[in-house]
């Protein structure tokens, strides 16, 4: 099937089939975008009733780090495209699936392997591409970890080589922080337990996500790199709590950001959305991380852009034209669960939606935790500052409560 020139009808022999590996809130939005284009979507996650499961044509629950289980589900469903939405996947199995011609992996199996942990992508960015990064060292024992901190110096940031949403991440400021940071990283890592990255602290003015799309240029039929306007964000313990678009920045810094994003995404190859995280201080820019998929800070694009990052991803992977233009200043603010319970309810929705320019996305996660992201408030405004104030006001109005 020549995807992009021809799309089929779901649940029929002509169907264009896409399998998402990871069906959280970001995957859910990708599924909705794909279904609007008539794509048949299969959602896979490690737990039942995940947000994406609730909107997909079919849902499966497997351990995605189990190569045999992953291969079996692909052989059973026979998707045309496999779209990883999380890091905790048996990427060697994806490479074998792609090599066997069973399905195309988005953006590529190699990109998925490189970005599944911080070591692969940091070595690509710093050592192969020569991009500016913070000083760093890797360690797989407490002794090596202590030596890495001595080499990098304090303060420094410690992260498991494989984790997401800030899990296992901490800042080491004094000797008293060293052992707790190691223990926290060991508890927070996914799959590759026992290995961490120690990063030197960068004194930055702000952080951005440069959403970067590799998609077909309809004028040339070749792959082209497109950029969204920069997304500013606030993170607490490595977890996004607020984002806005556009982030004001100098023309020099913007150009450097896009040069870095272009180099790293071109090296990864394939088609789709990439979230390139960068530190900015004045006109200086440092590469931090890249995800070969929509980014959580990019949830703001549901309000700010004509085509959200999820629609851009869907179009790009299907070989369709994209339009990353900004429509209006907008912001997002996270709604946390607030309590540990299954099947919670939300009060204050009416008040939240009464905020001018506001909208909500309640993700439908089956189980809440106090600091689990259960939804997000979105808001537009005449300025970024106005949008941020509205988004935070709407988020604060939503009150997760026990359904008992």
UniProtKB/Swiss-Prot annotation:
Pfam families for the chain: ATP-grasp, PurT_C, RS_preATP-grasp-like
Reaction catalyzed: N(1)-(5-phospho-beta-D-ribosyl)glycinamide + formate + ATP = N(2)-formyl-N(1)-(5-phospho-beta-D-ribosyl)glycinamide + ADP + phosphate + H(+)
PROSITE patterns: ATP_GRASP
GO biological process: 'de novo' IMP biosynthetic process
Binding site for Mg(2+): 277, 289
Keywords noted in UniProt: ATP-binding, Ligase, Magnesium, Metal-binding, Nucleotide-binding, Purine biosynthesis
GO MF entries: ATP binding; magnesium ion binding; phosphoribosylglycinamide formyltransferase 2 activity; phosphoribosylglycinamide formyltransferase activity
Tree of life domain: Bacteria
Any one Gene Ontology cellular component term annotated for this protein: cytosol
Pathway named in the protein's UniProt entry: Purine metabolism; IMP biosynthesis via de novo pathway; N(2)-formyl-N(1)-(5-phospho-D-ribosyl)glycinamide from N(1)-(5-phospho-D-ribosyl)glycinamide (formate route): step 1/1
Quaternary structure annotation from Swiss-Prot or TrEMBL: Homodimer.
PANTHER family (alphabetical): FORMATE-DEPENDENT PHOSPHORIBOSYLGLYCINAMIDE FORMYLTRANSFERASE
Stated name of the protein: Formate-dependent phosphoribosylglycinamide formyltransferase
Organism, scientific name: Burkholderia lata (strain ATCC 17760 / DSM 23089 / LMG 22485 / NCIMB 9086 / R18194 / 383)
